[in-house]
Regions:
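Short, internal acidic amphipathic alpha-helical interface segments
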Residues: 61-96, 102, 132-160, 170-240
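Short Lys/Arg-enriched alpha/beta "domain-start" segment
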Residues: 1-73, 98-150
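Amphipathic N-proximal alpha-helical interface segments
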Residues: 44-47, 91, 165-172
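Low-complexity, intrinsically disordered regions in eukaryotic regulatory proteins
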Residues: 235-251
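Ampiphathic alpha-helical segments that act as solvent-exposed interaction surfaces
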Residues: 66-90, 104-130, 196, 200-201, ...
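Short, highly charged C-terminal tails/helix-capping segments
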Residues: 273-290
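Residue-level detector of beta-strand structural context in well-folded domains
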Residues: 24, 31, 88, 153-155, ...
Length: 290
């Protein structure tokens, strides 16, 4: 399984460039979107060249999702744990954003390796924030417990007004994704890809990876979920996560893989579309010589 990078490459490069040229005092004001769902805004003024403001707008949550003060539950604690005193959370955030972080670049670690690691973590703010509730649940799984008030089906946002679902238990966490796509070609390609994905994992005998299944209809874990949340046109994918999948350093990898699963599938669908188009162009080219 190809893993998408957990950090924003553009944000990391911008941070590195800023740190290396901090005395030049160049003003910055950039907006961009990644994964088609997370919007970023960075600001640096000439008046305060050491202060880097990073604002993040998250996907609009569905009605089933738990947001606290505009953020997924556990996000504030996750931000403080990840960045410590080097980052200040502005309250309220900039208009139109869920979160604004104030970073004093003159106070970040002086050691080159530590500084780079810190900037990579800042550039991974999407993972830190959106992955926070998933991390809380999976950390409890690692200790074979269930997080307080989480002994029921939990909805987590991963796309605008779309959720994936977790059913936490002491010995496992079942994760279910209703897969939706807008384009009719994407639906066909995604359905085919997901069936092949599940079958390949089964036949390869990947005993160390989470068990995975796909179905046209909602699995029993989603009983009682609203009809809107179950409107999946590419089926449902389920993973069963056991404590061994979240032990030690495996936790970060599992959190990121689950947080970006839909983006991972979308990436492969788009790649297949490109290959199909290139194949059609090649076929037409060959036909022109007949």
């Amino acid at each position: 399984m190809i893993l998408l990078q957990s950090h924003s490459r553009f944000l990391l490069q911008t941070l590195l460039n800023r740190v290396h040229n901090i005395e030049k005092g160049v003003e910055l004001d950039h907006h961009w979107v990644e994964f088609d769902d997370v919007r970023y805004h960075i600001q640096v003024s000439m008046k305060n060249p050491h202060i880097f403001l990073l604002s993040v707008s998250l996907p609009t949550p569905s009605s089933e999702t738990i947001f606290v003060c505009g953020l997924p539950f556990g996000a504030i604690e996750a931000i403080k744990a990840a960045y410590g005193s080097h980052v200040q959370i502005l309250d309220p955030p900039r208009d139109g954003f869920n979160l604004t972080l104030k970073i004093n670049l003159s106070k970040i670690p002086a050691n080159q390796d530590q500084r780079h690691a810190f900037l990579v973590k800042v550039a991974s703010v999407r993972e830190v924030v959106l992955g926070a509730p998933l991390r809380v649940i999976l950390k409890h799984l690692a200790s074979r417990t269930v997080a307080p008030d989480m002994d029921r089906l939990v909805a987590l946002v991963h796309r605008p007004k779309e959720s994936f679902f977790l059913l936490p238990q002491v010995d496992k966490v079942t994760v279910v994704y209703p897969m939706r796509f807008n384009d009719s070609i994407d639906i066909v390609l995604a359905t085919s890809f997901l069936q092949e994905f599940v079958e390949a994992r089964r036949t390869a005998g990947l005993n160390n990876t989470p068990p995975c299944s796909w179905s046209h209809t909602p699995p029993v874990e989603l009983k009682g979920v609203s009809t809107d949340a179950l409107s999946a046109n590419a089926g449902f994918v389920s993973f069963v996560i056991f404590p061994r999948h979240v032990e030690g350093p495996k936790l970060d990898r599992t959190v990121w893989s689950l947080s970006t699963f839909h983006a991972y599938v979308s990436y492969h669908v788009k790649m297949e579309e490109v290959m199909l188009k290139e194949g059609m162009i090649l076929w037409k080219g060959i036909g022109s010589f007949s």
